[in-house]
Amino acid sequence: MSVLQRRIDDRLNQLFNFKKVGDWYREGLCPQCGKKELFTHAETPRVVKCGRLNKCGYEEHVKEICEDLFKDWSKDFPRTPENPHAAADAYLVNARGFDVSKLKGTYTQELFRNDRKYPDLVTATVRFKLAEGVFWERFIDRPERFGRQKANFMGDYKGLAWSLDDLDKLCNTQSIWVTEGIFNAIALSLSGQPSIATMSTENYPEKMLKQIADRCHELGRQKPRIRWAFDNDKAGKKSIRKFHLRAVQNHWDSTAALPPSGGLDWNDLYMRDQLHSENRKAHKHYGELHIAETPEQAGLLIYNFNDGRRRTFYFNHNYRLYWFNLDMDKYSKELERIEADPDRDFLLDSQKRELALQQCSAVSEICNRQLTPLYFQRNEITDESWYYFQISTPDDEMKATFTADHISAPGKFGPRLLSVHVGAWWTGNNHQLLTFMKQNTERLREVKTIYFMVYTKEYGAYIFEN
């Protein structure tokens, strides 16, 4: 057990008071629900989870719990003549979850200093080569000392991309996932999905794509599909749409993938063992939904992804709320008509079903804003309560309060929405409003107000002004 592993082991047992059962730590005290249901692997702890999956669902990576232990890699793992990359190796294994035996030769351990900008500061780095004279390096020794700068570029990387996979492997795969960061690309490639990293959501990898296209031509192979897979944030989603359209214009078969909302990227999912092929099906769906050109196309994507289990549902598309409805009687008759049509015998069964779905499904807009319930707030003294919602458009977002009366009747919800956000219209009916509100408020977080600066027995805490 390394020095770092011993420190992690000590910290986890101090925090959660685990009992060791075989190769596992169990019966730890969950910080979220207070029950002794916490568990993790004793020898190689990665993720600490609560066993009450439905009632609690607490899950946190060891790197986040013991954040202060993952900062000074050169001190904990000094380089030696036998291993000049000791700190870089340790960082990639412990902070990124990678098997470095599969990365040998793709990185080096270097030093970064900039006496003009950061006097007397130096850090070890993990450096990757993008092209001759072009490098990217990640700071690994207390990077917070350098403010917002956590990495450094050398050379012009415009149009370039980095990949763990060689050119021929990229050409011989069915699809290539395009991420922003190198560690995300490594996570995908080690999970069996060839990928490249653009280094920035503003960098369209034109030179790399040309290399792939030229090599495919030499090999006599069809070009692989490009799947844009940036982070699930505003910058990432904006670039996915932009680069997808550009790739299509450049005659690439293009689509998209997105990690789930919540802030986790591909490397985070890899460390949580959530990047297998079955997991990636959902990620592909999220991406395809994001680039859907019309709400009708988005509705059909959702219907098919759920295997037709729901005939009516609401969904968001381009910051607007829509309602999908499938008339099953009409669908059955239309499918029979298509199957009986001799001019359509060449269609596959799945294509016939898709054609019938297109003819018999209906999508209508029920709100020209995206509505996200945030939390419920209650004042027990005055018996007042409010539901907080985030109201979003492509250009801005704001928070607003709604009462129980507002959210339970279209006649009250519509005027309230219009009064808090200019031009925001609710056009759905009573059933659609109640369906949306019920599904979004049943497990909503609750915030209780405290109006006095005093010790509260209920929460076991002192409340101060500052």
Where are the language model's segments positioned?
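Terminal peptide-recognition signature
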Residues: 50, 92, 180, 188, ...
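Acidic beta-strand-to-loop metal/phosphate-binding motif
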Residues: 178, 221-235
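Short, surface-exposed amphipathic charged segments that create phosphate/polyanion-binding patches used
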Residues: 121-124, 210-215, 264-279
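Phosphate-handling DNA/RNA-contact segment within nucleic-acid enzymes
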Residues: 5-12, 116-222
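Acidic, metal-coordinating catalytic cores used for nucleic-acid/nucleotide bond scission
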Residues: 201-205, 230-240, 261
